[in-house]
Amino acid sequence: MTHLLQDKIIVRQFDVQPYEPVSLAMHNFTDRRDDKTPDEIWLVQHPRVFTQGQAGKAEHVLMPGDIPVIQSDRGGQVTYHGPGQQVMYVLIDLKRRKLGVRQLVTAIENTVIGTLAHFHIDAHARPDAPGVYVGERKICSLGLRIRKGCSFHGLALNIAMDLSPFLRINPCGYAGMEMTQISDLVPGVTLDDTAPVLVNTFLLLVGYSAPEFIPWNLDVQGEPLPG
């Protein structure tokens, strides 16, 4: 059973979902899972929202205006989510996969770097600032939480979105940090083009061989419902 669980991962594909119900669902899933629960990946977009991580400081939220600011228990500082950005949450039993937190962060960063390489974009990670960058511009944000030896939260990759709300914050606590996205570098690339590459690159890097893809939605209490 353990060997089969190590191979298996469920990939849930959501439509656009408000941040808070998805966050609640991640907490519920992590609290309820046991050593027989398969790992999961959740693919989702969020309506416009700023999320403030555990290390977040109020002074990095400059002019939120009409965009809500929600406190999150992920690592890191403030970032922005909106339509056209692919969020990928990774709910993984790290002990079962024999992964350390730093190894998972590196795998996520390399997943994004590999995905961007598929579209002929040269990207890199930085030791001083988590995430993925193209030149000096940030294209992907990263924030995790570990509970019971299991990860949740994940990455947010800018694909084809309105980047202007990032000007209302200091992204990830860095004043003047410029953002970029795939469609500005390779016009015409969409979320539908990117998501399969992102998922398959992650599965290959982390070593899952038996993915199961399921379209799902959430109810208002943050409980998954079949899509």
From Swiss-Prot:
Stored PROSITE patterns: BPL_LPL_CATALYTIC (PS51733), LIPB (PS01313)
Residue numbers marked as site, Lowers pKa of active site Cys: 138
Coiled-coil annotated residue ranges, if any: none
One GO cellular component term: cytoplasm
Ranges for domain BPL/LPL catalytic: 35-210
GO MF, any single term: lipoyl(octanoyl) transferase activity
Location in or out of the cell: Cytoplasm
EC number: 2.3.1.181
Functional pathway: Protein modification; protein lipoylation via endogenous pathway; protein N(6)-(lipoyl)lysine from octanoyl-[acyl-carrier-protein]: step 1/2
Alphabetical list of Pfam families matching this protein: LplA-B_cat (PF21948)
Record Gene3D superfamilies: Bira Bifunctional Protein, Domain 2
Sequence positions that bind substrate: 74-81, 141-143, 154-156
Known catalytic reactions: octanoyl-[ACP] + L-lysyl-[protein] = N(6)-octanoyl-L-lysyl-[protein] + holo-[ACP] + H(+)
SUPFAM superfamilies linked to this entry: Class II aaRS and biotin synthetases (SSF55681)
Enzyme class of the recorded protein, top EC level: transferase
Chief place of localization: cytoplasm
UniProt keyword list: Acyltransferase, Cytoplasm, Transferase
Active site, renumbered: 172
UniProt keyword Transferase, yes or no: yes
PANTHER family on file: LIPOYLTRANSFERASE 2, MITOCHONDRIAL-RELATED (PTHR10993:SF7), OCTANOYLTRANSFERASE (PTHR10993)
NCBIfam families with a match to the protein in the record: lipB, PRK14342.1
HAMAP family: LipB
Primary role: Catalyzes the transfer of endogenously produced octanoic acid from octanoyl-acyl-carrier-protein onto the lipoyl domains of lipoate-dependent enzymes. Lipoyl-ACP can also act as a substrate although octanoyl-ACP is likely to be the physiological substrate.
Family, per entry: Belongs to the LipB family.
Misc: In the reaction, the free carboxyl group of octanoic acid is attached via an amide linkage to the epsilon-amino group of a specific lysine residue of lipoyl domains of lipoate-dependent enzymes.
Protein name according to UniProt: Octanoyltransferase
Source species: Pectobacterium carotovorum subsp. carotovorum (strain PC1)
